[in-house]
Every structure is written in structure tokens, then in C-alpha cells.
């Protein structure tokens, strides 16, 4: 009896064990489903979060900022990466495509120069620095994005700005020195040189002009220089030297008279006018005679009024004939004469502009006799 009574209690634990296991299995399924649902929720929340916004600078500007932050003004590629990641949150995320952009901008832009490695630094790790010619693009910390083609425009405008800054409108003060109403006017020679050595034939001037002097001041010959400058050296004298000149000329408003000297010659040789010594009229000569004749100082004083230059069409070498006119101040003097000066291979542009500027009428009677050679 006792054995039969003890057996039934032993059976329920055996029967209850499968039920408990089944209940445990059913209870474990909701825990796995809950974990899966939590994972999907986290993925959805991560997908909705945007990465940090990209900085409002171009990659060129970012690289320049990194290089300029270094005391040595040069950085390696890894150091540039570290600077960008430490300063901008955009470069700290999982996106790594910005590194390719940095490398491409370093290698493809002329703003950056790859420095050669030292002997003690093998392998990779070149230093990068900024080209000195491109530093003006980032003056005063201007790193904002520029429109496309901005750098090309800057390079195109940089020589123009430097040229405009170097230019000045000081040509008149540099070329002319006005020292007052009765002072002198000096004109330094220009710096233009003729390609071919345009010289003046020394044979003509001694035969025609040698005897004519300025009472102790002979006329200096025009020296033929192989590389002489194309110039019009002129000096000024006071109005008392030429008393017969009009005061209505634009250049003679202050009483000063400007006279051309030694055109197409060196600055050393000049026709220097005497302050109180008049020109001496000599023995009459034939207008067309080019031979040398002695000149005597037996006539009254004369002053040089004006020299004309006109083109001789018969000469293929563009020969010019200058005809200076001499005006008599004395009413008793009736003789007039002309001296013909032959200047070969001379350009007439500057001489016309130089001699025509001080043309003015005379009160006395004048006559021009053309010479037909």
C-alpha cells in the first residue's frame, strides 16, 4: 500500500516537466522578436539622421587654411587630413570620399607645390606648400567659394593692375622744366633710337655754316653718330635775345623763347644762341651756290626767325632742305639772302613738330626764294 501511494506523486513531476519546457519555449520567442524590432527601429532612426553639413569653402581654400595654420607653411597629406577633421565635423563621419577630393586638388591645381623629400625621410609623405604666385588669391583671409574661372581672371588682370600702378602721367614734368617767365626751357632727348644709323653728311655743314658764327660762338657741327638718338634737344633763352619776336605765340607768353638745337644729333652738340650777340650778315651769296664762301662781319645785326623743312620729292633718300630766313631790323638794309642747308637721310616728322610750334608772323618784309637744284 505504501508503495502504491508513493508512486502517484512521482508521476506529476514527470508530466509537469514537458509543460514547463514548452511554456519556456513560448516565453523565449517574444524576447527574440523584441530584440529584432529594436534593431530595426535603431536603423530607421540612424537613417533619418543627416551627416554634418559641408563647410562653405572649396577644397582649395580648405587646403590653404591647413597649410597657413602651420608655422613652417608646409604640411603632409596626413597632416592636412588631421587639420580638417579637427576643425570641421563634416570630415569626422563615416564618409571618406572627401580624402580623394583633397588629393585631387593638391595634385591638379597649380596653387600647390610638392616639395622634394629630404634625405632622411624615405617613403611617402611629401610636403605641400602654397605657390607664392597664387597667394594674392587668398589675401586678407578671403576663403569663400569663388565662381568658376575666378583664378584665370585674376591671373589675367594681375599684369594689367601692375602696369597701371607703374604708369603715371608725369611725362610733362619729367620731359620739360619750366623755370619761370624769363628762365630757360630744357627738353631732354627721347630714348628712341633709330634702327639704321641715320647720319648727317659732315661735308655740307662745314662748307655752308663754318664761316657763320655768333661773334665768338661758332656753330657746332652736327656729329654723325652710329647709334645716335632720335631726339630734339632744345634749350630756352630769355626774351631779350630776340627782340623782334611776337609775344602772342603760345610758347612765348611768359617772355621765354624756345629754339631747337641739333636735331638728330647727340645732346652734347647744340646750336647755342648767344645772350646779347646778334647774327652777322655776310657777303651776298648765290641762293643756289653750295660752295664755301668766306663770311665777313660788315653788316648789321640779324636774328634767326625760323627754319623750314620741306620734302624734296626728287630725292629717293627723302632729302630735306632747311631754309632759314634772316630778317633785317634796320630799315636801311635791303639785301636779303638765303643759305641752303642740305640734310640727307633725315626724317621730317619730329622736325616739323618742333619747328612749327613757334611759328609767328613778323612785322617786317620777308621773302623766300626757292632753290632749284
From Swiss-Prot:
Q: Give Gene Ontology CC terms.
A: nucleus
- Give GO BP annotations, semicolon-separated: animal organ morphogenesis; BMP signaling pathway; cell differentiation; embryonic digestive tract development; positive regulation of DNA-templated transcription; regulation of DNA-templated transcription; regulation of transcription by RNA polymerase II; smooth muscle tissue development
Query: Could you tell me where the Low complexity compositional bias lies?
Result: 13-22
Q: Which InterPro entries match?
A: Fork_head_dom, Forkhead_box_regulator, TF_fork_head_CS_1, TF_fork_head_CS_2, WH-like_DNA-bd_sf, WH_DNA-bd_sf
Q: State the UniProt keywords alphabetically.
A: Developmental protein, Differentiation, DNA-binding, Nucleus, Transcription, Transcription regulation
Q: In which tissues is it expressed?
A: During neurulation and tailbud stages, expressed in the lateral plate mesoderm and in the neural crest-derived structures of the head and branchial arches. During tailbud stages, expressed in the pronephros and pronephros ducts and in cells that migrate from the dorsolateral plate to the ventral region of the embryo (with the notable exception of the heart). These cells may represent hematopoietic or endothelial progenitor cells.
Which part of the chain engages DNA, per the record? 54-148
Which CDD domains does the entry link to? FH_FOXF1
* A GO molecular-function annotation: DNA-binding transcription factor activity
Pfam families to which the protein is assigned, alphabetical? Forkhead
> What is the name listed in the Swiss-Prot or TrEMBL entry for this protein?
Forkhead box protein F1-A
Query: Which compartments is it annotated to reside in?
Result: Nucleus
Q: What does this protein do?
A: Probable transcription factor. Required for smooth muscle (visceral mesoderm) differentiation during gut development. Also required for normal proliferation of the lateral plate mesoderm. Acts as a downstream mediator of bmp4-signaling.
Q: What species is this protein from? A: Xenopus laevis (African clawed frog)
UniProt region (Disordered), positions on chain = 1-51
Amino acid at each position: 500500500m505504501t508503495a502504491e501511494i508513493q508512486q502517484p506523486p512521482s508521476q506529476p513531476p514527470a508530466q509537469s516537466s514537458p509543460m514547463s519546457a514548452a511554456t519556456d519555449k513560448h516565453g523565449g520567442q517574444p524576447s527574440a522578436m523584441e530584440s529584432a524590432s529594436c534593431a530595426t527601429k535603431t536603423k530607421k532612426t540612424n537613417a533619418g539622421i543627416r551627416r554634418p553639413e559641408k563647410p562653405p569653402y572649396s577644397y582649395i581654400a580648405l587646403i590653404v587654411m591647413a597649410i597657413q595654420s602651420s608655422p613652417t607653411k608646409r604640411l603632409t597629406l596626413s597632416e592636412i587630413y588631421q587639420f580638417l577633421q579637427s576643425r570641421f565635423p563634416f570630415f569626422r563621419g563615416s564618409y571618406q570620399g572627401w580624402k580623394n577630393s583633397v588629393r585631387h586638388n593638391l595634385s591638379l591645381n597649380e596653387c600647390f607645390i610638392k616639395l622634394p623629400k629630404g634625405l632622411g625621410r624615405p617613403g611617402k609623405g611629401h610636403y605641400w606648400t602654397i605657390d607664392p604666385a597664387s597667394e594674392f588669391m587668398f589675401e586678407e583671409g578671403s576663403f569663400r567659394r569663388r565662381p568658376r574661372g575666378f583664378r584665370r581672371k585674376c591671373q589675367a588682370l594681375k599684369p594689367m593692375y601692375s602696369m597701371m600702378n607703374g604708369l603715371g602721367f608725369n611725362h610733362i614734368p619729367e620731359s620739360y622744366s619750366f623755370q619761370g617767365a624769363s628762365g630757360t626751357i630744357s627738353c631732354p632727348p627721347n630714348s628712341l633710337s633709330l634702327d639704321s644709323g641715320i647720319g648727317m653728311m659732315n661735308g655740307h655743314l662745314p662748307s655752308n655754316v663754318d664761316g657763320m658764327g655768333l661773334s665768338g660762338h661758332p656753330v657746332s657741327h652736327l656729329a654723325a653718330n652710329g647709334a645716335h638718338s632720335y631726339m630734339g634737344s632744345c634749350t630756352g633763352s630769355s626774351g631779350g635775345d630776340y627782340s623782334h619776336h611776337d609775344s602772342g605765340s603760345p610758347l612765348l607768353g611768359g617772355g621765354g623763347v624756345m629754339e631747337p638745337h641739333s636735331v638728330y644729333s647727340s645732346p652734347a652738340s647744340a646750336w647755342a644762341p648767344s645772350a646779347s650777340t646778334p647774327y652777322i650778315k655776310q657777303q651776298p651769296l648765290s641762293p643756289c651756290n653750295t660752295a664755301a664762301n668766306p663770311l665777313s662781319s660788315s653788316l648789321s645785326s640779324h636774328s634767326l626767325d625760323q627754319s623750314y623743312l620741306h620734302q624734296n620729292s626728287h630725292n629717293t633718300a627723302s632729302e630735306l632742305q632747311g631754309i632759314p630766313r634772316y630778317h633785317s631790323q634796320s630799315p636801311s638794309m635791303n639785301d636779303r639772302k638765303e643759305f641752303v642747308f642740305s640734310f640727307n637721310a633725315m626724317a621730317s616728322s619730329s622736325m616739323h613738330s618742333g619747328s612749327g610750334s613757334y611759328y609767328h608772323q613778323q612785322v617786317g618784309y620777308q621773302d623766300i626764294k626757292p632753290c632749284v637744284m
